[in-house]
Amino acid sequence: LKDWTFHSFADAGENVCVLTENDEYILFHSPPNGIGILKSPNLKDWKPWGELITQGQKDWLWARGRITAGTVVNLKHVSGIEHYLMFFHGSGPLKETEGDFDKNASIGIAWSKDLIHWQWPVN
């Protein structure tokens, strides 16, 4: 781990989380707002996959400013859960540029069976 070789660049923001699924790598990252997904067969060549995930942001005062830092855990093999779980950071009601990022922050949860379609608590 002392010497690294640069192979490529993917515009992936920050706060990355990588899962392996069907011999592919799926990277969740934080663009300016929302949670992006990239897919790779080899950890070098990354392509966008799916839509930008913003969950129910338009309806959530607590996350209207920004959604970021999605971390996904594969619990599909756990009886009674059988989903992927995503934990993410939300800030609001103001945008980060308006000074709300560190003052009003919350953690959200969502779940999915396929990493594309997500559900979250209504209340």
Model-found features: residue ranges?
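Carbohydrate-active catalytic/glycan-binding domains of CAZyme proteins
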Residues: 1-123
